[in-house]
Design a protein with these regions (language model features):
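Signature of uroporphyrinogen-III synthase
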Residues: 1-212
Length: 212
């Protein structure tokens, strides 16, 4: 029977899916005074882990989070004023919150290799935004025996996971791919990925199971 592999930094508890970690997150040192800003925007739950890593405590600051998992991480960290985006694609989320950020001084905690045009859209829209690189995805070297066998179904959760999978294992034309979103799908242009309707790991897994 074909196997489903989740290529992601986020693991699933679903025992029918193999977790494959080809990337790891490194948090970067920075200093920031949250009280200098009117809002915090985040496109990953790693933003809150980066705040914790740097010993920065939550304050009564509105947070604009890209999706439910990101909003949950904000709440768990200690923020209470949280706007959860209706759009889980970076570019669409930027356009959604742009009118809400006009006239505000905004902080954006981002990854080193952000795949979307999120920051550029807000900047061109006239938002006063300060971007801080708070974390980065680095290659997690894997042994070749971990390479998925032929005809496996691979779920990719980000563009960097595609690149790091290729660095570790190369590619097999028999693989079937599922992408969590549009930007990741572009990175999979050498295959024909199915794009999940919902930018959520569980939704991707449900889609993968329809292919078994």
């Amino acid at each position: 029977m074909r196997k489903i592999y989740l290529v992601s930094n986020t693991k699933t508890a679903d025992e029918s899916v193999v977790n494959l970690s080809v990337s790891s997150i490194e948090f970067l040192k920075f200093e920031i005074n949250l009280s200098e800003f009117d809002a915090l925007v985040t496109t990953s739950k790693n933003a809150f882990k980066a705040l914790k890593f740097n010993g920065i405590l939550p304050i009564n600051l509105p947070v604009f989070a890209i999706a439910n998992s990101c909003a949950a991480a904000a709440r768990e960290f200690g923020f209470s004023k949280i706007y959860t985006g209706q759009n889980a694609h970076g570019d669409d989320f930027a356009r959604e919150i742009l009118p809400l950020l006009k006239g505000k001084k905004v902080l954006y905690l981002k990854g080193k290799d952000s795949a979307s045009n999120f920051l550029e859209i807000l900047q061109k829209g006239g938002v006063n935004i300060k971007a801080v690189v708070a974390y980065e995805n680095v290659l997690n070297p894997c042994k070749m025996e971990l390479k998925p066998p032929k005809n496996s179904i691979l779920i990719f959760a980000s563009p960097i996971n595609v690149r790091n999978f290729l660095s570790n294992f190369g590619w097999d034309e028999s693989y079937q791919t599922i992408s969590i979103g549009k930007v990741t799908a572009k990175e999979l242009k050498f295959s024909t990925p199915l794009v999940s309707q919902s930018q959520d790991i569980n939704a991707c897994i449900a889609l993968a199971k329809t292919l078994l």
